[in-house]
A protein has these predicted regions:
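Lipid deacylating catalytic domains
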Residues: 1-65, 69-76, 116-190, 194-314
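A basic- and aromatic-enriched beta-loop-alpha substructure that forms the phosphate/nucleotide-
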Residues: 64-121
Length: 314
């Protein structure tokens, strides 16, 4: 069985486990190769003294994107518009992304919440909110790091996050896709974006079921886990007194975020998950949330290598 399990993020509904693996596995192995070369040079031990790069068959992709694929023909494809941002949670998440984009990109205007509050009628309030959603989408699609991304893609990704957090059936089936790859051989779990939420919850669930899973390292990339109102407070299991539960089957955790990744609104998650989390910052260039950019970062390679070597907390 695979020693490394990768859990993908949003927007993969038209891919498959195999197509994702073609992109993910080489980049993950490349990141470890960088860390291996660094360790060999530092220790002067040569390549034989560093952790081996995992073989392709040692890396598995936990795929759940099909759960978000719309049924029917191409004509039924989801052509989302501003009016489709309907729930309060969707609106809250969109506003968080907008605020973070404005904080990290001087070209993005900051949100003005004054238009969404006050003593107005329901219809007027809905009209103001729709106008705010349109402004948010305009701001985000004009951001330096989201140039070329369409409204329907942003809204679709937004809805996938919210559906996972609010739809019990989606949550159960998505976690089952991850759990299917967690075995006594699993040493490292690498997760990206929404996949970090799945990975965390799947590890907690496996521990609760008493399964023989002992992961040396969890590597979370571009994670929204630290967003208290939207994500953290909706986790299973729920946080206790503001502190999230540490999975009993996990030895070490490295959390990595790009300095401008708007999805990782809270880049330091140690305050919520405990001081054992090692929060690191990287720079992914113009593709701040791209999974392959994260995987090729040497910081990611080091974390994966430490997990494979069994030196995760040394």
């Amino acid at each position: 069985m695979a020693r490394v399990v990768f859990v993908h993020g949003v927007g993969k509904q038209y891919l498959s486990e195999d197509s994702l693996a073609r992109d993910i596995v080489p980049e993950l192995r490349g990141g470890v190769r960088l860390a291996r070369a660094e360790a060999a040079a530092r220790d002067g031990a040569g390549a034989d003294g560093a952790v081996a790069v995992p073989a392709p068959e040692d890396v598995a992709v936990a795929f759940y994107g099909d759960l978000f694929r719309p049924a029917g023909t191409r004509a039924d494809d989801e052509n989302f518009q501003a009016a489709d941002v309907e729930s309060d949670l969707e609106f809250e998440l969109l506003m968080a992304w907008w605020a973070e984009a404005a904080r990290t990109d001087p070209q993005v205007p900051a949100p003005d919440e004054s238009g969404t509050r006050g003593k107005v009628g329901w219809a007027a309030a809905q009209g103001l909110r729709l106008k705010t959603v349109r402004r948010a989408l305009d701001a985000l699609t004009g951001a330096q790091f989201l140039e070329g991304v369409r409204d329907r893609v942003l809204i679709g990704n937004l809805k996938q996050v919210v559906r996972y957090l609010t739809d019990p059936d989606i949550r159960i089936r998505a976690q089952a896709a991850v759990a299917a790859h967690l075995t006594p051989d699993t040493r490292v779990v690498v997760a990206h974006s929404l996949g970090t939420v799945l990975a965390y919850e799947a590890l907690c669930a496996a521990a609760a079921r008493g399964e023989k899973v002992n992961v040396q390292m969890l590597v979370t990339l571009g994670s929204p886990l630290g967003m208290r109102g939207v994500v953290l407070n909706r986790l299973h299991p729920a946080p206790v007194d503001g502190r999230a539960v540490w999975p009993r089957n996990l030895r070490a955790w490295t959390n990595i975020a790009d300095t401008t990744d708007i999805v990782a609104v809270v880049r330091e998650i140690a305050p919520a998950f405990g001081p054992a989390v090692d929060d690191l910052v990287v720079h992914n260039g113009t593709h701040m949330h791209d999974a392959t950019r994260y995987l090729t970062a040497i910081e990611t390679g080091r974390a994966v290598a430490a997990g494979l070597a069994g030196t995760a907390d040394e």
